[in-house]
Amino acid sequence: MNQIPEALLYTKDHEWIQLHQDGTATVGITDYAQESLGDITFVEFPLAGESFNTGDTFGVVESVKAASDLYMPLDAEVLEVNDEVDAEPELLNSDPYQKGWLLKIRLTDASQVEALLKADAYAGII
């Protein structure tokens, strides 16, 4: 069974978002996503400082089964990428919600948060 932490928000593209008080957020892929992909072997990250709109492709996750685009969940600027995942992509498989985060972002339109899914709604689509 897939882990779906209640405190996070989700997208239909199987990404999770943890909002922070300072207008930033952490983004990663869900347990369902990593399980569907299988053993993850590579992650293509954006550069810190790049800006994206909701739905823009910001990177790629490659596994032994497939390559899958990553989509920005909100209009945002990339503040930081997870260098540990860059060095050890398997962290996305072993710990997708803690050590396996992908990006830290600064939201540029906080009103978009309302379009994200709560845990129970996300559970309903997987």
Spans of features found by a protein language model:
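Short, conserved catalytic or interaction motifs in soluble domains
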Residues: 63-66, 83
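Acidic, low-complexity mobile loops and tails
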Residues: 1-57, 90, 94-126
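Conserved beta-strand segments that form the floor/walls of ligand-binding pockets within enzyme
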Residues: 28, 71-73, 80, 104
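Short, charged/polar surface micro-motifs in flexible loops or helix N-caps
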Residues: 34-35, 77-78, 84-85
